[in-house]
Amino acid sequence: MTELQLNPFSNPLFEAVQMSRIFPDGKTFVDCRPKQSYEKILEAFHTENKKPGFDLKQFVLNHFDLPVPHSVHYRSDTTKPVAANIESLWDVLTRKPDKENGSLIPLPFPYVVPGGRFGEIYYWDSYFTMLGLKTSGRYDMIENMIGNFSYLIDQLGYIPNGNRTYFIGRSQPPFYAQMIKLLADKKG
């Protein structure tokens, strides 16, 4: 990854978008996927934002794909017990392996996110998710998620808070060994 890919949020475009509040929250823009390289987008911004009638939101829509919610149509079934609802959520909250694009650091295996809005895995949240997966007998997914954390260790030297470039500067309490133990208890 280039320096700009690792930290695409230290530039005039990012500052303009976040300060203008064209999106309802600060997460939307940082999770957008660029349609071309950051360098080309910043070059276009530098040229276009000086023109009369420049529309920042339209510029962003022209140069980025907005994040798409994954589970918009999911509704829990209040007639089912809580455990049955949780079982039905695993597939809703599962994300497929990623391609490198935007702030999302690609992972090689499927993983479970903490909620429908999220497209990224979170470190210590994942341990508690794995406890639920263990109860559901989903050791395949536990193994996938451990594989992803192992991949992050190989790539970065540690496990960041989540697999977004804006999480690279921080981590969470160490749960990797406990994750491995969950799988070792089953597989030996």
Task: For each feature predicted by the language model, list its residue ranges.
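Acidic, mature catalytic/reactive cores of soluble proteins
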Residues: M1-G188
